[in-house]
């Protein structure tokens, strides 16, 4: 007979965090405004593909923040033939690196009063039907009693903590394709200087909070998989920060987007989420390790 205490379910830990933070579930409401900050810098072919995928669906606005140098790229916002999406604003010469562009985009969308605040980079391509599926994630989570702070249609198997009915609970959702509920976007913007994490610190975070092990091995020059502490870009800190404020990050099953620049298998990118594979990525519940052996 096993006398060891049963580990709490991930969903129960999430509900506890919500209670502590005082967050509440919210489904999208009629009249809610959705805006995406699209970041671009040259790479016109990538930007066109991103726009074509986005524009398959409507119901949202785009605030386009461009840092391009080339004349062709700078001209694109004025000539792209939008059919469904609404181009609300174009801002040129948004420079200083990706984090400055991200913060500018979040701040601008919040200033404009959007209820849902999104980020899309110009190297992600969505499938038709992506937008209603994205918005439905907030409703699916709310039906489970989950306060969804961030949702994505670009889902990697290795970033899933748990598969639910119709959606995944994720441990990592980056800036390439993400939609925040407005209060969650305000948290991220306010906490942006505190988002820095490394592979070791993010592993410790999830081991302590959710009792899951993240296998964040990387390949060295000889092709061998090794465990090493690597500094991560700031967007890796989005999801941990949201959990600490009572918000959950979720994704579609299956993934409805693909990355143009980095293929699946690139640094910490596993295969995209598919419906027939459950928790096939890099996350496992923790075994009862002896003291001192936890990450």
Walk through the language-model features, giving the residues of each.
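Hydrophobic targeting segments
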Residues: 32-38, 54, 60-64
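Short, well-formed alpha-helical segments that are part of the catalytic scaffolds
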Residues: 43-56
């Amino acid at each position: 007979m096993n006398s060891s205490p049963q580990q709490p379910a991930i969903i129960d830990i999430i509900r506890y965090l919500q209670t502590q933070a005082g967050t509440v579930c919210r489904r999208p409401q009629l009249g809610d405004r959705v805006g995406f900050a699209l970041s671009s810098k040259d790479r016109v072919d990538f930007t066109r593909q991103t726009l074509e995928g986005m524009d398959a669906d409507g119901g949202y606005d785009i605030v386009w923040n461009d840092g391009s140098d080339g004349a062709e790229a700078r001209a694109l916002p004025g000539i792209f033939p939008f059919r469904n999406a609404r181009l609300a604003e174009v801002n040129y010469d948004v420079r200083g690196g990706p984090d400055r562009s991200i913060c500018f985009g979040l701040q601008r969308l919040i200033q404009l009063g959007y209820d849902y605040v999104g980020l899309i980079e110009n190297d992600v391509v969505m499938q038709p039907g992506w937008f209603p599926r994205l918005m439905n994630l907030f409703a699916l989570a709310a039906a489970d009693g989950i306060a969804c702070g961030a949702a994505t249609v670009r889902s990697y198997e290795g970033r899933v903590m748990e598969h639910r009915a119709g959606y995944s609970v994720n441990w990592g959702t980056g800036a390439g394709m993400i939609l925040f509920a407005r209060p969650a976007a305000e948290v991220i913007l306010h906490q942006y200087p505190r988002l820095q994490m490394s592979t070791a610190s993010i592993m410790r975070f999830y081991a302590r909070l959710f009792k899951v092990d993240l296998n964040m091995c990387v390949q060295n020059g000889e092709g061998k998989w090794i465990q090493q502490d690597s500094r991560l870009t700031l967007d890796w800190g989005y999801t941990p920060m949201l959990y600490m404020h009572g918000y959950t990050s979720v994704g579609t099953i299956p993934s409805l987007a693909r990355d143009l620049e980095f293929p699946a298998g690139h640094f910490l990118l596993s295969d995209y989420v598919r419906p027939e594979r459950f928790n096939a990525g890099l996350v496992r519940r923790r075994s009862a390790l002896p003291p001192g052996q936890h990450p």
